[in-house]
């Protein structure tokens, strides 16, 4: 992807974030801005890799706001919840479940930003397997599963909302036949299968505080009459890419992740779309968010939103966020949109961060 001039991006960000004020980000009418803030992230990929991925964004955000922004990757969702709740982080990039638990437990934060992916403010979790015999019919290449008014339906990979493994953006939009340094990427395969078939299987979840990596899938299992603790062998991998790896390497029979986390492996494992088959999906989940401490001045919170929005409008920002979290834009978040997550947690009896 062509990267625009970083200088031009920085200049635009500074103007938008500060409202073209000559005072920069030193202070505002609703309170003095701190000299530095900390932005916490949860690893959806390997922790060390994510730390490297977010650093360019931290540098740009620091320049846009006129204050230092430190990026910190916590070990898991619980670590970020604790960091935000105890004031060790001022901003946090949360999954929807992590946000609702943190807000419920500490109450000293508000949802500021909601991710938008390819025009959608919701997504779903996907069930994956390396065993084609689990499928009701033969897996089909270059397909995906989507929630529709008629229930879960198989669609072409180009028609899926989320960008699927093996799909890339060409000059005319989405296209099949992505190539990486390691070779041509196999388009993702999917099939339909009943969740009742996974009883007794090794299941790779991500984290107990992950919405698509545990909460919604666990609720699905209960609704299917399967105990997510005793009727399967649960494995917590710590990340969405790690869950895909577990299925790919046959360390688990089944795995769950966001749609389509298989893309995170495509540069090293070009056949991941063939070997890891999507066979079911969860109901729709509100996209992840950035929550901000209520101790931050309102003007700073607004400037943060504007700066992130502007950065995503640059080629560099688009590339960084797509590679790290798959975000293509953002919108103002509304807390009530996450009631569906709270209801799912209540159904499972989860009222505080796990771990």
Predicted regions mapped to residue ranges:
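C-terminal motif of bacterial Sec signal peptides marking the signal peptidase cleavage site
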Residues: 14-19
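Bacterial signal peptide processing site
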Residues: 21-24
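An extracytoplasmic/periplasmic, membrane-proximal ligand-sensing/linker region
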Residues: 33-37, 45-56, 292-355
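Short helices/loops that flank or line small-molecule/ion binding pockets
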Residues: 73, 78-92, 101, 105-106, ...
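A ligand-binding cleft/hinge motif common to bilobed small-molecule-binding domains
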Residues: 96-107, 217-223, 248-249, 253-274
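Short beta-strand->loop
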Residues: 109-120, 231-233, 266-284
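A conserved helix-loop-strand patch within extracytoplasmic ligand-binding domains
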Residues: 115-209, 213, 222-224
């Amino acid at each position: 992807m062509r990267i625009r001039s970083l200088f031009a991006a920085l200049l635009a960000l500074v103007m938008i974030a500060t409202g073209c004020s000559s005072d920069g980000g030193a202070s505002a009418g609703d309170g003095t801005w701190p000299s530095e803030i900390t932005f916490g992230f949860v690893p959806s990929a390997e922790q060390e890799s994510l730390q490297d991925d977010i650093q360019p964004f931290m540098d740009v955000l620091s320049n846009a706001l006129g204050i230092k922004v430190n990026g910190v990757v916590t070990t898991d969702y619980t670590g970020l919840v604790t960091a935000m709740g105890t004031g060790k982080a001022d901003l946090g990039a949360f999954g929807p479940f992590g946000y609702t638990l943190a807000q419920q437990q500490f109450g000293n934060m508000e949802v500021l930003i909601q991710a938008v992916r390819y025009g959608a403010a919701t997504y779903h979790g996907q069930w994956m397997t390396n065993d084609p015999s689990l499928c009701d019919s033969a897996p089909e290449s270059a397909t995906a599963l989507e929630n529709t008014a008629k229930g879960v339906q198989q669609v072409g990979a180009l028609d899926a909302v989320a960008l699927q493994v093996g799909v890339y953006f060409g000059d005319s939009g989405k296209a099949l036949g992505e190539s990486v340094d390691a070779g041509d990427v196999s388009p993702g395969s999917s099939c339909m299968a009943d969740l009742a078939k996974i009883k007794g299987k090794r299941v790779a979840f991500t984290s107990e505080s992950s919405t698509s990596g545990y909460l919604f899938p666990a609720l699905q299992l209960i609704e299917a009459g399967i105990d997510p603790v005793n009727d399967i062998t649960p494995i917590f991998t710590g990340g969405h890419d790690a869950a895909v790896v577990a299925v790919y390497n046959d360390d688990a029979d089944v795995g769950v992740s966001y749609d389509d986390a298989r893309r995170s492996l495509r540069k090293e494992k070009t056949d991941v779309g063939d070997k890891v088959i999507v066979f079911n999906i969860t109901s729709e989940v509100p996209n992840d968010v950035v929550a901000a401490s209520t101790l931050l001045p309102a003007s700073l919170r607004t400037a943060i939103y504007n700066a992130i929005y502007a950065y995503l409008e640059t080629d560099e920002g688009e590339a960084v966020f797509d590679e790290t979290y798959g975000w293509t834009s953002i919108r103002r978040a509304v807390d009530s949109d996450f009631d569906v997550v709270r209801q799912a947690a209540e159904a499972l009896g989860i009222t505080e961060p796990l771990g």
